[in-house]
Amino acid sequence: MRVLGLETSCDETGVALYDSERGLLADALFSQIDLHRVYGGVVPELASRDHVKRMLPLIRQVLDESGCTPADIDAIAYTAGPGLVGALLVGASCAQAVAFAWGVPAVGVHHMEGHLLAPMLEEQPPRFPFVALLVSGGHTQLVRVDGIGRYQLLGESVDDAAGEAFDKTAKLIGLGYPGGPEIARLAERGTPGRFVFPRPMTDRPGLDFSFSGLKTFTLNTWQRCVEAGDDSEQTRCDIALAFQTAVVETLLIKCRRALKQTGLKNLVIAGGVSANQALRSGLEKMLGEMKGQVFYARPRFCTDNGAMIAYAGCQRLLAGQHDGPAISVQPRWPMESLPAV
């Protein structure tokens, strides 16, 4: 089965073609970072308009690169949620229109299920069951995964997601958008131990997260430095390192708890923040000590992309699931509500 996947949940337009027998045939992505950078964050209306502009050229590009024609496509998969409602509607409308024109079924895919399954595109994919850490700009969740659609939520952020905290913190200390890569870049030049930030909610039982207080702690630290006349680049680097270390160690502590609680040995990390090298290194070291294994997608499939949507959609289509012709999206959509495959 060949499935064309469309991703438009936020500020990246992604298109990919996945073959259930041959794997990923082609993928293309257009990022709107430059469009939104001047505003310091994503402007939903601008995101929707740019998806309209980019979608059809990217579909043509993927078909050309794969050597396929519309007659070779068996189905369309698209992100139906969660995400920005306008952006989701662009993708859903396009998917349903193309599916109707080509005479093939369409299926809406949960954006975070796409992220969760992205490591399945690698040469050595994880096997069920495993614990998944979903960590992105909109979500920070620990999930027990026993199969596709068989998800048990173990813990989640009660306020800001980790990726959101990275972006907001970067803005507070005068860095550009997107903040995650900027903080990681500065952290490489930071002085270890100059600042020590708290590890939120690690001094109590449970697997929930909280990052809003850490963001405030960072702001107060920066303001004290500025008031003391120390707003140097090195101080920014030191604060960036302290913040990143606090987030990473908090995630490590919770992941260790989740693995011990479930008795599982394999961990999947997925979502945009899973590209962070400090997080990857920390998890690899921890899983090595626990005689377990950590799995993640290649960096370009950690952020939003069409390949993960094509793959996830293909699995559900092979199980006989598909949508009717109505255009429907869910900006808020609990992953645990998905049917099992």
From Swiss-Prot:
Co-factor binding details: Binds 1 Fe(2+) ion per subunit.
GO biological process, one term: tRNA threonylcarbamoyladenosine modification
Any GO CC annotation of this UniProt entry: cytoplasm
EC numbers on record: 2.3.1.234
One MF annotation (Gene Ontology) recorded for this entry: N(6)-L-threonylcarbamoyladenine synthase activity
Main location: cytoplasm
Pfam families for this protein: TsaD
Binding site for Fe cation: 111, 115, 304
Subcellular location: Cytoplasm
Alphabetized UniProt keyword annotations: Acyltransferase, Cytoplasm, Iron, Metal-binding, Transferase, tRNA processing
Catalytic activity, reaction form: L-threonylcarbamoyladenylate + adenosine(37) in tRNA = N(6)-L-threonylcarbamoyladenosine(37) in tRNA + AMP + H(+)
Binding site for substrate: 134-138, 167, 180, 276
Cofactor(s) essential for the protein: Fe(2+)
Domain of life according to the entry: Bacteria
HAMAP family: TsaD (MF_01445)
Name under which the protein is recorded: tRNA N6-adenosine threonylcarbamoyltransferase
Originating organism: Pseudomonas aeruginosa (strain UCBPP-PA14)
